[in-house]
Every structure is written in structure tokens, then in C-alpha cells.
A protein has these predicted regions:
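Intrinsically disordered, low-complexity regions
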Residues: 2, 10, 89, 93, ...
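Alpha-helical protein-protein interaction elements
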Residues: 77, 127, 205, 242-243
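Intrinsic-disorder/low-complexity loop/linker signature
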Residues: 24, 117, 131-133, 182, ...
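Long amphipathic alpha-helical segments with strong coiled-coil/leucine-zipper propensity
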Residues: 87-173
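An amphipathic, hydrophobic-aromatic interaction surface with interspersed Lys/Arg
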Residues: 1-82, 138-232
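Context-gated lysine
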Residues: 7, 97, 108, 113, ...
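Long, intrinsically disordered, low-complexity Ser/Thr/Pro-rich regulatory/activation regions
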Residues: 233-258
Length: 258
């Protein structure tokens, strides 16, 4: 459940491709054109603070990611720049429609003069054809809220920090052990599959929002599973204790029934 936003309203706006105003800025849904970058950076949204080293886990989201990356850069040089903080900044650039080439001029990091590892604020200048120039000073606490907004606009859910960390790790270990093979996951094949199903050219997908793309992809997947399970059960080749595991081609099961 969203802590700061009306989830259904944010999703409605995101599906329309329109921006959501927040903190004096305009946040846009990320499009399929940038899906590869989004997938490479989404771990910055879904990271569990409770699974970070204790020194970072006790900090707020923005400060934890920022100080963690500063420490990594001090230890590993340029290699340390590829952390959660950099990924979050890339997602911010995409969401604000800032030109990556001018991002360093449009997003300024303000740190404590006595402790450069302490983030004080982001000073952001955003210019769009629709809304002109916007200026905002964003606090670390607001960055945590922006994290939630970007996740909602692009169909992602934030982790529940109250979940049992040891149980989560155990489940991840089991999934790793049970992985029989690795798929060659790539955007070209995924886009080709969706385009073929929708009878459109692949390049037309680039302007879709990620949220719409994923909803269509999941609908295709649900429909195929509904048919395969239904045919299998009708033929007598397989019998499901509680009926078709995917009982509808149009709707998902309620979560408590999954």
C-alpha cells in the first residue's frame, strides 16, 4: 500500500503518459525506449534497507544509498560509481525527462560541508516543452517519496521492510538452487514477441509506457496459461485439485488466494 500517494490515481495518470506533479517538479512515466536502462537500475527502487550492512540500514533511504556509494568509491575508485545511488539518479533523470548529457548541470548534490558523506539536498532544474522551467530543492526524505512515486508510475512495488529478512534470503537461495536453466533475456526478443502479438512494428512500442507494456505482457501471459491449463485439463492429461490455476484470461487471482 502506498504511504504517500493514491496508487490508482498515479497509475491512471501514468497509463495516459502524463506527468505527476510533485515537489515542484513533473515526473513522467518511463517509456519502453528506455526499458533496458530501467531494468538495469530498478534495483535502486526495490532494494531492502534491512538487508544492507547495519551502518546503512539504520539511515533513511537516500542517505543510505548515498553514503554507501561514497564508501564504495573511496574503496574501489570508479568501480564504486555503479551503486544504488547512481542507479536512482539515472531513474530520476529519465522520470524528469532531463537530457543525460546535461544531467550534472540540472541535478546538483548539496552535502554537509563538515561531512561530505551526509547528503543535505538535491537542487534540480527541470525544463520541459509542456511546463517550461521548474526549480526545486529536494530533501533526503522527499527522495524516499520520489522513490515510491517512480515505482508506482512504472508498475513496481516497494519491499516491505517488516518482512523477515532471513526468510527472504532463504527463499532466494532456494530459487537459485532450483533454477534448472537460464533464459537469454533481452529486450529485442521481448519487444518482438509483444509486437507480433499486437500486430504492430517493434519501434511503435518505444513510446508505450513501461506500465502499459508490462500490463499487456502479463495479459498475454495470463491468456496463454488459461488456455494451456484449460486444454490440458479438458483432455484428461492433467487434473488440478482446485481447478484451473489461471481461472480467467482477463483477471488475476486475488493475492490472498494465490
Amino acid at each position: 500500500m502506498s504511504q504517500f500517494f493514491d496508487k490508482s490515481e498515479v497509475r491512471r495518470i501514468a497509463l495516459s503518459g502524463e506527468p505527476v506533479p510533485f515537489c515542484g517538479l513533473y515526473f513522467y512515466p518511463i517509456t519502453v525506449e528506455h526499458y533496458g536502462i530501467f531494468l538495469a537500475c530498478e534495483s535502486a527502487l526495490t532494494v531492502r534497507l534491512s538487508m544492507l550492512p547495519a551502518v546503512y540500514a539504520v539511515q533513511n533511504y537516500a542517505q543510505a544509498l548515498f553514503s554507501m556509494q561514497i564508501d564504495a568509491m573511496m574503496q574501489n575508485g570508479e568501480a564504486g560509481q555503479l551503486g544504488y545511488w547512481s542507479r536512482m539518479m539515472q531513474l530520476l533523470v529519465l522520470s524528469l525527462k532531463i537530457n543525460p548529457e546535461t544531467a550534472s548541470q540540472c541535478i546538483k548534490m548539496i552535502v554537509d560541508k563538515d561531512n561530505p558523506k551526509t547528503l543535505k539536498a538535491l537542487v534540480i532544474t527541470q525544463t520541459t516543452s509542456e511546463n517550461g522551467e521548474s526549480f526545486a530543492r529536494i530533501t533526503p526524505q522527499q527522495i524516499g517519496q520520489i522513490r515510491e512515486l517512480i515505482a508506482l508510475m512504472n508498475g513496481r512495488e516497494l519491499p516491505d521492510e517488516a518482512d523477515n529478512v532471513e526468510l527472504i534470503q532463504a527463499e532466494q537461495d532456494v530459487q537459485e538452487l532450483n533454477r534448472a536453466f537460464e533464459l537469454d533475456v533481452n529486450m529485442e526478443d521481448l519487444k518482438a514477441s509483444i509486437a507480433a502479438n499486437q500486430h504492430i512494428r517493434m519501434k511503435e512500442l518505444d513510446q508505450w509506457t513501461i506500465l502499459e507494456f508490462d500490463l499487456i505482457k502479463n495479459a498475454i501471459d495470463r491468456d496463454k496459461h488459461f488456455m494451456v491449463y484449460g486444454i490440458g485439463e479438458a483432455s484428461g492429461m492433467v487434473k488440478f485439485k482446485n481447478g484451473n490455476p489461471v481461472p480467467s484470461p482477463f483477471f488475476n487471482k486475488k493475492k490472498e488466494n494465490v
